[in-house]
């Protein structure tokens, strides 16, 4: 996977945690490969309804490892959740609090929960920690609200999908110094890889599409998004000064 990523010109990877059970493997990989970084968090759809999962102390301990450069992914997802969702709100608040305490930015997921996501980010002081709205699939007003809080917005392979007009509208408007590009692997492989397992190398296809959409050359977009990554995640070590 790493060899294919390197061959595609992808020099750095952030392996995002969706549960603490898998975090150990992510951290081990990040310690072995200097171009791979880790995040620590629990996805809103994981362990649904568990008010104390993860506990404050479990999450606080998880984010302490030096290869962990971010807290998340966290956030709100009402698409597949039903009933009382207070546990999601509490879990999101817990992640924000720890992000502020340790000074590591947030990786935020939001789906069908725009109002509550932005409201909690404002109430809990997420702007103090900073972060990114990852795999963004919502509308421009939501993106603008996050940008106003100092957050970045990350575009995935969804932007290449035929029915993704809303995402393309957002992708055109994100300021260049707040734009990131990602895979969300193993899901959401971009065109021309739809139907296949997504992997880091495919971010090059999304970047190529995004560059054309925004009317810039690929080299410029690749350099800008790489610079943005290291600006957002200052604990990530850049191997070379000018590479991406």
Q: How would you describe each model-predicted region?
A:
Residues 1-244:
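Mid-domain alpha/beta scaffold segments of enzyme catalytic cores
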């Amino acid at each position: 996977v790493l060899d294919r990523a390197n061959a595609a010109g992808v020099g750095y990877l952030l392996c995002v945690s969706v549960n603490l059970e898998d975090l150990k493997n992510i951290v081990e990989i990040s310690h072995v490969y200097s171009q791979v970084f880790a995040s620590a968090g629990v996805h809103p759809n994981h362990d649904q309804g568990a008010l104390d999962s993860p506990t404050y102390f479990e999450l606080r301990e998880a984010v302490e490892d030096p290869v962990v450069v971010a807290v998340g992914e966290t956030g709100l997802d009402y698409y597949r959740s039903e009933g009382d969702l207070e546990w999601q709100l509490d879990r999101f608040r817990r992640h924000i609090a720890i992000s502020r305490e340790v000074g590591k930015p947030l990786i935020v997921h939001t789906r069908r929960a725009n109002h509550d996501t932005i409201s909690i980010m404002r109430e809990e002081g997420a702007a103090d920690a900073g972060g990114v709205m990852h795999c963004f699939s919502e509308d421009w007003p939501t993106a603008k609200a996050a940008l106003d809080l100092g957050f970045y917005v990350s575009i995935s392979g969804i932007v290449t999908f035929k029915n993704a007009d809303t995402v393309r509208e957002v992708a055109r408007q994100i300021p260049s110094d707040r734009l990131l590009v990602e895979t969300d692997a193993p899901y959401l492989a971009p065109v021309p890889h739809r139907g296949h397992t997504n992997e880091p190398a495919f971010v090059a296809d999304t970047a190529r599409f995004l560059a054309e959409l925004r009317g810039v050359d690929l080299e410029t977009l690749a350099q800008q998004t790489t610079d943005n990554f290291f600006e957002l995640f200052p604990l990530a070590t850049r191997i070379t000064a000018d590479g991406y």
